[in-house]
Regions:
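Glycine-rich, phosphate-binding/catalytic loops in enzymes
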Residues: 25-27, 99-102, 125-126, 179
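Active-site cofactor/cluster-binding pocket
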Residues: 61-122
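Short glycine/serine/threonine-rich phosphate/pyrophosphate-binding segments
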Residues: 17-23, 90-94
Length: 347
């Protein structure tokens, strides 16, 4: 990397703030080092990330743009170096999986997820790291190039650190994350601006979807210290759901006292997607990996199912007894209050 190279940065399907922020932050740094850089994503990114500097240059595979896949694949084919950010398995990049796998370019993995496939030539991998954005910052720091981090790069990286720690609230938040955030603020990151753009720029449709989910779709299973939410494809269409609109819905369940596991499943038509969030020592990633072709972190994981939404729900309910003791550990006892409201049971 001492000489200018054609660089492609690839991140996972449905990129979140850590995926896009780390990618654009790294891209900004590499451009300052005179590399020709193209960020490629295997799908669109959420609208609430469209403030990130450099987002307009992202080449996103979009089903509504017939040539976007071809252009993305061509960019990968032309690359001399490919950075793979925020994913440890090639199946996380969908239609770009084979182009990246078959590329003769040098591949560099920067990631913090468990059980990497080790497909890259070089790895900057740490499963104890809270975010990929934090690892990108560490990489730039270790190269002695912190002075290259300007406000644009800092804001992108700060967004990744902030969101993957749940606003510095999750158990993965350590002194290291605060130190990284402090250095990024020192380099020009604006915490209040980043927080507002990510958390406080909801559309009316997204707010109505959130209200509907919380009032009609959230189900509590007190005996398992568990909450689940199911959304059908028709329900998603009803609220004109856009990329990113369901982001964060799974987290609401964990705000209920005594809940240790929250699961959100929704019908994407071609498959059922599941998001898992847990508290304490409950391994959400093990459940996702064992039963739903997924994985991730101990307290934040994802999966999928080829069954129908109803069949997926029944499968999930059938396996909960297996985890009853684990879910009860350190769980606070609480009562489920049921009252009649307009002839309906309100939980």
């Amino acid at each position: 990397m001492h000489n200018p190279k054609r660089v492609v940065i690839v991140t996972h399907f449905k990129p979140d703030a850590d995926a896009l922020g780390s990618s654009l932050g790294l891209a900004g740094y590499l451009k300052k080092k005179d590399h020709a850089v193209q960020v490629v994503t295997p799908s669109d990114y959420p609208g609430f990330l469209s403030w990130m500097p450099g987002h307009k240059e992202v080449l996103a595979v979009n089903k509504d743009q017939a040539d976007s896949l071809q252009r993305a694949q061509q960019a990968v084919a032309n690359a001399e170096v490919i950075f793979c950010l925020d994913f440890s398995s090639l199946n996380r990049i969908n239609s770009l999986q084979d182009p990246v796998k078959n590329s003769t370019a040098k591949k560099i993995l920067v990631d913090h997820h468990l059980e990497p496939e080790h497909f890259a030539d070089f790895e900057h991998w740490d499963p104890k790291a809270a975010s990929t954005a934090g690892l990108v910052f560490d990489l730039i720091d270790k190269l002695g190039d912190k002075n290259y981090i300007d406000a644009d790069i800092a804001n992108c990286l700060y967004a990744g650190v902030m969101t993957d720690t749940g606003g510095f609230r999750h158990s993965n938040t350590t002194q290291k994350e605060f130190q990284t955030a402090s250095e990024l603020v020192g380099a020009g990151a604006n915490p209040s601006f980043v927080s507002k753009m990510i958390y406080d720029t909801n559309t009316i449709a997204r707010m109505k979807l959130t209200g509907y989910v919380l009032s009609q779709k959230l189900t509590v299973l007190p005996e398992f210290h568990t909450v689940y939410i199911c959304l059908s494809h028709d329900e998603l269409k009803q609220f004109n759901t856009q990329t990113g609109d369901t982001e964060g819905l799974v987290n609401f369940g964990l705000s209920i006292e005594g809940i240790r596991l929250s699961v959100f499943m929704y019908d994407r038509k071609e498959e059922i997607k599941l998001s898992f969030r847990s508290l304490g020592n409950f391994p959400a990633n093990e459940m996702a990996r064992k039963y739903f072709e997924g994985g991730g972190h101990k307290n934040a994981a994802g999966g999928s199912s080829q069954l129908s939404l109803e069949e997926t729900l029944q499968k999930f309910l059938s396996i909960l007894p297996e985890y009853k003791e684990q879910l009860a550990e350190d769980g606070e006892e609480f009562e489920l209050i049921v009252k009649k409201t307009n002839g309906k049971n309100e939980k």
